[in-house]
Swiss-Prot record:
This is Large ribosomal subunit protein uL22. GO terms for biological process: translation. GO terms for molecular function: rRNA binding; structural constituent of ribosome. This protein binds specifically to 23S rRNA; its binding is stimulated by other ribosomal proteins, e.g. L4, L17, and L20. It is important during the early stages of 50S assembly. It makes multiple contacts with different domains of the 23S rRNA in the assembled 50S subunit and ribosome. It comes from Oceanobacillus iheyensis (strain DSM 14371 / CIP 107618 / JCM 11309 / KCTC 3954 / HTE831). Belongs to the universal ribosomal protein uL22 family. The gene is rplV. Disulfide bonds: none annotated. Pfam families: Ribosomal_L22. Gene3D superfamilies: Ribosomal protein L22/L17.
């Protein structure tokens, strides 16, 4: 059985969130939370919140044991991009893309043996 949590339209660029998500993929839940607590990146608290939500979903909805959970999938997709303009010299303007992310974390119970 697997439990999943998704955070949509998080205002951090997907490229930056992927750096954090790559650190925890395939790890045990306790180890992943420790890694996120000691990673100094802006996306770390957001990814930790999604992971804790996935753990809570596993415990509440599927009655899994939190100590035996492993992160089976963790991925980041690109959300909608907010397009903004920055004034430049000579009356010109350049476009600023404010990118958003959809963060998904899936946890499963560790296979015994």
């Amino acid at each position: 059985m697997q439990a999943k949590a998704v955070a949509k339209s998080v205002r951090i660029a997907p490229r930056k969130v992927r750096l954090v998500v790559d650190l925890i993929r395939g790890k045990e839940v306790g180890e992943a939370i420790a890694i996120l607590n000691h990673t100094q990146r802006g996306a770390s608290p957001v990814v930790e919140k999604v992971l804790k939500s996935a753990i809570a979903n596993a415990e509440h909805n599927y009655e899994m044991d939190a100590d035996s959970l492993v992160i089976s999938e963790a991925f980041v997709n690109e959300g909608a991009t907010l397009k903004r303009f920055r004034p430049r010299a000579q009356g010109r303007a350049s476009r600023i893309n404010k990118r958003t992310s959809h963060i998904t974390v899936v946890v499963t119970e560790k296979k015994e043996g």
